[in-house]
Amino acid sequence: MAMSLKKIGAIAVGGAMVASALASGVMAATTSGDVAGFMKNAIKEDGTPNVDIVVGSGAAVMDVVSAADVAAKIGSMAYKTGVVEDRSAVVKVSAKAESDDVNIFTLNATNEDIALVAAADSDYAKGFINGSDQLKVTDQLASGSIQDVNDADFNATSLGDVSTMLKVPDIDPSDWYSNDDDAGEVVFTRIVYDSDKLSIDEDQILYASIAYKNDEDVFNDNNTVTLKPGMRIPFLGEEYAVVKIDDEDDIIYLGKEAKDGVLKEGEXFAVGNGYEVKIASILKSGDTSTEYSVNVQILKDGKVVKEKTDTVGGSSSAQLKLAYKDVGVVVNDAWEDIAGTTGYAEVLITKDTKALELGEEYIPDWEAYAALNNSDKLEIKKDITESDKANIIGIALKYVGDKKKKLGDRDEVDIANYLKLVFDDEDKNDVLKVKFLMDESKEVTLDIGQKATVLNAEVRLKDILADAQQSVKLTAPIAKLDSEVSLDTADKNLILVGGPVVNALTKELVDAGKVAIDNTSPATLAVVEGAANGNDVLVVAGGDREATREAAKALLEMI
């Protein structure tokens, strides 16, 4: 079955971008030609790709995954210099990607309303649609919002993934809760017919970041994870840690990791901008207790501006949570050395800490909400209680701006300054296609050796050059279908993923006797010089899709 391969455009900067995890025990591939030399030239000096990746129109899912992995890995070969400030740098990361599209006229010829969903992972999007083609949202959310869940004629449609929306593959990297769960971004919109014109009203666009159990993607009670302090989730393309969920003031605090580790009693950690966090004291509660009374201070320019003492550890696994302006602190555990003379605290300290005031506008026209799982359906709330905290599985932003009227060709609807919903009639009378689009840039400040996850790329600052001042935009190569590329007109080097059965360009090379691959071939990496309009070609293939996957893994190991 032919597959539609969307453009892959995440930009990896400054060191290493984590692509799909590779299985252990990678097999060696049969090589022909200078594979290492080919890959050395995959990125130009200006940071732009010198290669297109081509997958067959009839490719299996495994071939598509291999192409995506190779694209991401090539992006990680580039380096980015930022604005130097002491031993840190401001690094700009950009990304462009789009979802599948749908022709509204074909989807709803009878002028019925439609609901669209896309996500960081296409399975998350599909997992939000039930067997009756309805979104899994509560009546409370649906009332005047995403859709009427009781309307059997109301069809919801998945537009798959926007590959640069962020998915966090491990929300508990410090193993505070001994899990390896995931979290991903999802976006919903409802388009209604209003006097035969398309419109989007207030409350009819929703962005959400939701925590799922490991390898689960269907939204239901069994598959989502309750948010707890220290967990990492995506928020508008960047990875944040949960600092505190405050049910008294209806605020969820999120921050970017500054330190995740252990501080000794009396030790201070410099967060930046004059702020420090100090573990002022750690006192044991009794001779046999595992509970400790911990005092934490936040200092600004050497003066204490916020202080808290609370119980940590014990049978209840109590935590200390504290937030002040840009700084957040979670103390997860505490203990003493064997002599009982020095205390230690396991801490998460965050910078750029944000207070999401529920029911208030986080940015103009977008209100913040807690996202809950209510009997297999998504619910959003602005007034949360202590009992609600057990069901909070994410955060959400809801559109509360003016109605978008008479939507048509070339119209764009902004989604939280992060995504867009775009319309295109392709110059045809019976066509109006709609899709989600991202064309976004973000800046992140990193110390040497520090990493951050932003726009679905993991960025690590390897080093700072003395003259590192110039900003260079780096772009990962774009994956294309074999129907979009010709060996006769190619303007750059090509990587062909898949053998002659699934990739038409590979078949051309085989038929011309330039590469030898058939259905019995092992994992193969073969460079054919000058075969693409004077440009070189690297074939990544094997006798079947498993062999092709092994060839791709072998290539990634070589880079």
Curated annotation (Swiss-Prot):
The entry's keywords: Cell wall, Cell wall biogenesis/degradation, Glycoprotein, S-layer, Secreted, Signal
Main location per the UniProt record: secreted
Signal peptide coordinates: 1-28
Coiled coil: none
InterPro entries (UniProt xref): S_layer_C (IPR022651), S_layer_central (IPR022650), S_layer_MJ (IPR006454)
Biological process per Gene Ontology, one example term: cell wall organization
Glycosylation sites: 108, 130, 155, 222, 373
Cellular compartments annotated: Secreted, Cell wall, S-layer
GO cellular component terms, A-Z: extracellular region; S-layer
Keyword Cell cycle: no
Function per UniProt: S-layer protein. The S-layer is a paracrystalline mono-layered assembly of proteins which coat the surface of the cell.
Family (UniProt): Belongs to the Mj S-layer protein family.
Record-given protein name: S-layer protein
Gene: slmt1
